[in-house]
């Protein structure tokens, strides 16, 4: 055995590393989205506790602008709905990546364990 991996195994290892990087990126995105959903939930909860006549402000870029409570609540609900959809998409992508990772691991085990690999 020359110590060098066959091209097929090298390719499978590269694919496995790529899938692992994709999984890490998705996990990071998922974490950020979960934080944003939680913040939206907290804001909606606080808005639910205050009277209708209380002055409410919302952030738009670097500005804080006075707004109607109902408008702010609707905007937050829409934002949360969008975030929830994005989160569900990320979760589905994570599931697909996990399946692909498992599939590649099995292929790699088969390739490394095959008797023909050591003949080169």
Regions found by a protein language model. Give the residues of each.
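Short, charged, low-complexity amphipathic alpha-helix
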Residues: 1-16
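Short coil/loop "hinge" linkers that interrupt or connect long alpha-helical coiled-coils or helical hairpins
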Residues: 46-71
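Generic alpha-helical secondary structure signal
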Residues: 7-10, 70-74
């Amino acid at each position: 055995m020359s110590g060098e991996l066959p091209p097929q195994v090298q390719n499978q290892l590269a694919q496995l590393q790529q899938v692992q990087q994709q999984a890490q990126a998705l996990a990071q995105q998922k974490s950020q989205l979960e934080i944003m959903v939680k913040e939206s939930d907290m804001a909606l909860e606080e808005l639910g506790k205050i009277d209708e006549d209380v002055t409410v402000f919302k952030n738009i870029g670097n500005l804080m602008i006075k707004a109607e409570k109902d408008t702010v609540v609707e905007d937050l609900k829409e934002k949360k709905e969008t975030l929830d959809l994005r989160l569900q998409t990320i979760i589905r992508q994570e599931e697909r990546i996990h399946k692909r990772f498992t599939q590649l691991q099995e292929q790699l085990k088969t390739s490394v364990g095959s008797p023909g690999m050591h003949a080169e």
